[in-house]
């Protein structure tokens, strides 16, 4: 159980501001949370192995395969307009100026 002064200090450290009518509600809720944490701390967990996942299934991995990832020729085949040939040569999309 925490005191009202401790609750006010925690609120100040967390930069929380409460009106006088809501500080009591904050104190009550914080006390309840701290009581729940105390209950959890009483549980003996020394014989329980930590979980890395909630289901014990192993992930099926695929074999790594080296593939060509150069899609630039396919991308630049879709370029149209006056600058299409230049875009294919320099491998940049040429767009109209949008910022002055």
Curated annotation (Swiss-Prot):
Enzyme Commission code(s) on record: 6.3.5.-
Gene Ontology molecular functions: asparaginyl-tRNA synthase (glutamine-hydrolyzing) activity; ATP binding; glutaminyl-tRNA synthase (glutamine-hydrolyzing) activity
InterPro entries the UniProt entry points to: Asp/Glu-ADT_sf_sub_c (IPR036113), GatC (IPR003837)
Superkingdom of source: Bacteria
Nucleotide-binding in keyword set: yes
UniProt catalytic activity: L-glutamyl-tRNA(Gln) + L-glutamine + ATP + H2O = L-glutaminyl-tRNA(Gln) + L-glutamate + ADP + phosphate + H(+); L-aspartyl-tRNA(Asn) + L-glutamine + ATP + H2O = L-asparaginyl-tRNA(Asn) + L-glutamate + ADP + phosphate + 2 H(+)
GO biological process, one term: glutaminyl-tRNAGln biosynthesis via transamidation
Coiled-coil parts of chain: none
Gene3D superfamilies reported for this sequence: Glu-tRNAGln amidotransferase C subunit, N-terminal domain
Keyword Secreted among record annotations: no
Pfam families per record: GatC (PF02686)
Keywords assigned: ATP-binding, Ligase, Nucleotide-binding, Protein biosynthesis
Top-tier EC class: ligase
Known partners and oligomeric status: Heterotrimer of A, B and C subunits.
Similarity comment text for this entry: Belongs to the GatC family.
Role played: Allows the formation of correctly charged Asn-tRNA(Asn) or Gln-tRNA(Gln) through the transamidation of misacylated Asp-tRNA(Asn) or Glu-tRNA(Gln) in organisms which lack either or both of asparaginyl-tRNA or glutaminyl-tRNA synthetases. The reaction takes place in the presence of glutamine and ATP through an activated phospho-Asp-tRNA(Asn) or phospho-Glu-tRNA(Gln).
NCBIfam families attached to this UniProt entry: gatC
Protein name per its UniProtKB record: Aspartyl/glutamyl-tRNA(Asn/Gln) amidotransferase subunit C
Lineage: Bacteria, Pseudomonadati, Pseudomonadota, Alphaproteobacteria, Rickettsiales
Gene behind the chain: gatC
């Amino acid at each position: 159980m925490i005191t009202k002064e401790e609750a006010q200090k925690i609120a100040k450290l967390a930069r929380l501001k409460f009106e006088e009518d809501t500080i009591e509600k904050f104190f009550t809720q914080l006390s309840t949370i701290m009581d729940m944490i105390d209950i959890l701390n009483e549980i003996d967990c020394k014989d329980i192995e930590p979980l890395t996942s909630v289901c014990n299934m192993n992930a099926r991995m695929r074999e790594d395969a080296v593939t060509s990832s150069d899609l630039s020729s396919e991308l630049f085949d879709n370029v149209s307009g006056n600058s299409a040939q230049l875009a294919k040569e320099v491998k940049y999309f040429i767009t109209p100026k949008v910022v002055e």
